[in-house]
Amino acid sequence: MEHFWIDAAGLPAEITAQHPLTRRLCHDYEIAPPQSPAVLTACAEPETAMRLADGTASPAYLEFLCIHDSLAAQLPAHHRFLMHGAAIAFDGAAYLFTAPSGTGKTTHVRLWRQYLGSRVTVVNGDKPFLSLEPDGTVRVWGSPWAGKVPSVSHSAVSACWSAARTASAACRRNRR
């Protein structure tokens, strides 16, 4: 077993992992052990692993998903949550694209980067952290669960409240 800490939307989270893959996937978010106890703790619970097992995922990847679920369950108590969506920063504001898997979130990120170049930074390609700050603002943070597009920014970006649900594949076909 390995213990390490990550930054989970500004909160220290202690991770207990059996598989080296988990630490590798969390590497960009790893922090030094905090002076005070971790606010969040996560390890792979056998019940969660059984629920997520579909026969195709490796035990190491199942552990990574279990840790995701464990953190996701604890975050709301701290005014934070993980959201399924792709997040970019553009001119200092975060934009979040939400939709079911396979409907074009990654494509939207790629197109924004293609047409707007260096003004666009990928915050997270699959499951960013969101936090509600004491002043009422929402911030978007990267997370280790980045999907197909690697996160570039690991700092928080103020959201502009412009979450967009991407069009379904059928709608995209009709417009081509």
Go through each PLM region and give its residues.
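A noncatalytic interaction/capping subdomain that flanks phosphate/NTP-handling catalytic cores
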Residues: 1-101, 111-123, 129-176
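Hydrophobic positions on the alpha1 helix immediately C-terminal to the Walker A/P-loop
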Residues: 108
